[in-house]
C-alpha cells in the first residue's frame, strides 16, 4: 500500500530567482510524488499566508527555510503511515496541524507542497496521469488559453496601469491550433513593437512590457498584431484584461488613480463606465479584478453593467476561497473565479471552490502565478476539472511554456477531448 514513508523538502528557485518550496513524498510501495509551489507578485489581502524567513542576509529576506523546516519537522512526523490515496483526510490533517484560518503557522507554501506531492504520489501509485487521478472519468475538455501578451502594472516596469492584456484564441477546434494562433500573434506583436521602436523585453509572465502611452494603446497594438497574423478579432481571437485594480486603488482618496491617464482619479462608477467604453470599442470578453478586492459595492455595479456581456473574474476578490465565493454568489458579484492553488493552500479546498463555482454557473479559470517553476500541475488541473480556461502566461519563458507543452501531451492522450472555444463562456447572455 502507498503509505507515506518519508517527506523531504528543499528550498529551490522560481522564475524570478526567488526561493520557493519543493516537496517530495516517498511511500512504502515505492510510489513517489514531487511538487513545487509558485509565488505571486500582486497578492490578495485575504490569501493564505506564504511563509518567508525575513532574514535580510539571505535572498533579501525571501528565504523559505522555515517553511522547509515545518515540512520536515512538523508535518512529516504527523503524516507518516497515512495512505497517499486519502487526499481529503491528508488535507484536513494539514489544516488542523496549522491551526489558523490563513495557514500562517506552517505556511501555505509548506502545506500546498505536501498536499500536491501526496496527490502526485497517489497518481504514481495507480499508474495514472495526474489529471486522470484528480478528474477520474471527468476529463473531457481542453482549456482555452488566456495568453498574457502585454504585461503592465506589478508585473512590469512600464507606464501601463493594467497588469495584463491577454488574447483568447476561441476560433480553433483544438488546443494545439489555439496555441498556434496565440504564438503567431505573439511573434507578430514583437515585430510591430520593433517597428515602432519599442522594446521587446518581457515581463514576469513572458509578455512584452513596452512603455506605452495608455492602456488603450496596448489594446490597439494587440488588435494590429491579430490582424497582421491573419486572424479576425472578435471571431478567431478575443481580448482579455487583468486590471488588478487593487494595485492602483488609493485607499485615502477611495479612488482609482490611473498614471497613464495623467493620474486621473476615478470613482468606482466612473471606472466601470471606462470599462464599458473599452468593451464597446474592442472585442473584450474577460476582465479580471476590475475593482478593488474590498469594493463590493463597485463590483456589484460592474456586474450589473457588464455581467451578462463579458466574463468578470474575481481573483483578489475571491482568493480561491469558498467563503469569499459564497458571499459573491449570494450578492451576485462577478460571474467567474480565478483559481490559484497557493491562494488557499490545499488540493481539496481548491477542488471544493471549483465545484462551488460551477454549481452557481460561475466559470473557473485555472491560473499560474507570476513567480512560476517547471511544475505543470495547473495544466493537469485545468483538464481534470473541465475548467475550460487556463491562464499561464505568454509564448515565452520555459516556466510558462512547460504548462502549454503539458496540455499538448494531454490532448494527444485524450484524443477526442473537445476544444469548445467560445462555448466555454456558457454563462454570458449577450
Curated annotation (Swiss-Prot):
Pfam families: Enolase_C (PF00113), Enolase_N (PF03952). The active site is at 205 (proton donor), 340 (proton acceptor). SMART domains: Enolase_C, Enolase_N. GO terms for molecular function: magnesium ion binding; phosphopyruvate hydratase activity. It is found in: Cytoplasm; Secreted; Cell surface. Pathway: Carbohydrate degradation; glycolysis; pyruvate from D-glyceraldehyde 3-phosphate: step 4/5. Binds a second Mg(2+) ion via substrate during catalysis. Its EC number is 4.2.1.11. One of its GO terms (biological process) is glycolytic process. InterPro entries: Enolase (IPR000941), Enolase-like_C_sf (IPR036849), Enolase-like_N (IPR029017), Enolase_C (IPR020810), Enolase_CS (IPR020809), Enolase_N (IPR020811). Its cofactor is Mg(2+). One of its GO terms (cellular component) is phosphopyruvate hydratase complex. Keywords: Cytoplasm, Glycolysis, Lyase, Magnesium, Metal-binding, Secreted. (2R)-2-phosphoglycerate binds at residues 163, 340, 369-370, 391. Mg(2+) binds at residues 242, 288, 315. Coiled coil: none annotated. It catalyses: (2R)-2-phosphoglycerate = phosphoenolpyruvate + H2O. Gene3D superfamilies: Enolase-like C-terminal domain, Enolase-like, N-terminal domain. PANTHER family: ENOLASE. Catalyzes the reversible conversion of 2-phosphoglycerate (2-PG) into phosphoenolpyruvate (PEP). It is essential for the degradation of carbohydrates via glycolysis. Belongs to the enolase family. HAMAP family: Enolase (MF_00318). This is Enolase. It comes from Onion yellows phytoplasma (strain OY-M).
